[in-house]
């Protein structure tokens, strides 16, 4: 059954770019935030992402991408916390690239299973390492947008930790950026 339109993102952004969804997968280990990235078919690192399934909400679609591409299961926020622009090769056209707008949803990973897409090499990185990997083989404007998503995700994780567990844990997390 199709979800109500109000729960879905538009198929095109205000600038006319096609819209996809990404799961910004994270975990906290030893007071440090880590992000789970996967390889694209073009060999770049990225967050698990893909099209919005017409039978799922945008956040459910992002969670599905996390499971399929990275084998990540967990709790996903229902509302995206940011967006960024990236490029994608046109299907079947090796040399044709188009811009896409990606809505980012924060997903706290609770469990890892074998990903359906076994060639994606899901790997955990610190925030700085994630920003460095995400910048590889990308033009600065795309790398900067991804770096802002990582920073915003860290800020959200710290804010959530503060509201749930008090200032002590939050200050330890902020030191481990």
Spans of model-derived segments:
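Short, solvent-exposed loop/turn segments that connect beta-strands within catalytic domains
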Residues: 28-34, 93-96
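Short, acidic/hydrophobic/Gly-rich beta-strand patch recurrent on exposed beta strands
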Residues: 36-39
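A short gly/proline-enriched turn/hairpin at secondary-structure junctions
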Residues: 46-49
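Charged phosphate-binding loop/patch that engages nucleotide di/tri-phosphates or the phosphate backbone
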Residues: 137-177
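Unchanged
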Residues: 52-142, 175-177
